[in-house]
Amino acid sequence: MPFLVGLSPPFLYFELIGHFQVEPSPTPTIKGRKWWRLSLFLIFWGERRVKKETKANDC
């Protein structure tokens, strides 16, 4: 999964987030919350990696 986030265009992030918001529940399950947290982590990690790579390429 992480390699997908590192290489994917931004619209995939929104797709990911939208996918987790498809089923709204008043009390999110632990599993759902874990997946949500994992997806956010992967998104931020991927963005940071992309920024690092673009910075390295700019030099």
Curated annotation (Swiss-Prot):
Disulfide bonds: none annotated. It comes from the Eukaryota. It is found in: Mitochondrion membrane. Keywords: ATP synthesis, CF(0), Hydrogen ion transport, Ion transport, Membrane, Mitochondrion, Transmembrane, Transmembrane helix, Transport. The chain crosses the membrane at residues 7-23. It is a single-pass membrane protein. Its main location: mitochondrion. Belongs to the ATPase protein 8 family. This is ATP synthase protein 8.
